[in-house]
Amino acid sequence: MASLKNKHFMIGLSLTFIVALFSFLAAKLPILDKVGALTIAILIAILYRHFRGYPEQYSSGITFSSKYLLRFAIILYGLKLNIFDIIGQGSKLLAIDVGVVIFSIVMMLFVNKLLHGDKNIALLLGVGTGVCGAAAIAAVAPIFKSREKDTAISIGIIALIGTIFSLIYTAIYAIFSMTTNVYGAWSGVSLHEIAHVVLAGGFGGSDALKIALLGKLGRVFLLIPLTIVLILIMRFRSSESSSKGRISIPYFLIGFVIMALVNTYVTIPSALLNILNTVSTICLLMAMVALGLNVAFKDLKNRALKPLMTIIITSICLSSLAFIVVHWLYS
């Protein structure tokens, strides 16, 4: 019996790994490199669920990917941060980043209220838009006690919209006259994922990409204080409503902070850092596959339309406002 359970666990884990690896490699191909591995992974998982159903017998391995590998990926995500660079070279951008995070969450909730959408998904999208996309959504989902299908829908939406916006940014840069500093800073402080920032920022050249990454990593850094604030708010609300259902601290975020400190104070060989970043990406993709398997097409039909409209409106407003601020500071 135990061996059968172990076999089912390994099959479930292998399923998420195979789809994740395929998505990782497919995203390196022309055209698909614009779509992104996250989007590919989630779409494959949702299509698998639609045509084959949820593989219930392998759920232990799938759940392991959606919970433990996701947390491990977020811990390793901290290795992307160098706190000295963000506070030093990127201090001006960090000030903008604070405004971006606050604006994204508040605007998302405001538009969502007008559209009578799902508040939990709007919160996830607000944090994802303001901070760092899928990783931020996954990090705060336990704080909001979000359902896995809501987390998956939010991540799928933000991956798709971020890709579209990054392509729009490259078109705007090609058509209109814009300095590399303005373009890089604008991309860094307003696009959703690091991958989107790399895609758009890289189009402006190495100087634009450098400042874009500084702007983006400042937002990743803000995940630390933001989660603390959110935990305090949710704990206060839970204590007001009842003593039950206390909000626990997502301890993997402590690992995220430790990794950020390690990368700041310890010189890690670039080869090792590349390996760890790849491991982090694969683990994150495996988690996305596992989350995507929890989403049926009827969920997308019933729950994704209003959040999609909400994030489009919010992203347009954020991009416009961010451009005005960046143009004023860097022109």
Curated annotation (Swiss-Prot):
It is a multi-pass membrane protein. PANTHER family: INNER MEMBRANE PROTEIN YEIH-RELATED, UPF0324 INNER MEMBRANE PROTEIN YEIH. Belongs to the UPF0324 family. Keywords: Cell membrane, Membrane, Transmembrane, Transmembrane helix. Its main location: membrane. The chain crosses the membrane at residues 9-26, 31-48, 69-88, 93-115, 122-144, 154-176, 183-202, 217-234, 247-269, 273-295, 308-330. It is found in: Cell membrane. It comes from Staphylococcus aureus (strain COL). It comes from the Bacteria. One of its GO terms (cellular component) is plasma membrane. Disulfide bonds: none annotated. This is UPF0324 membrane protein SACOL0411.
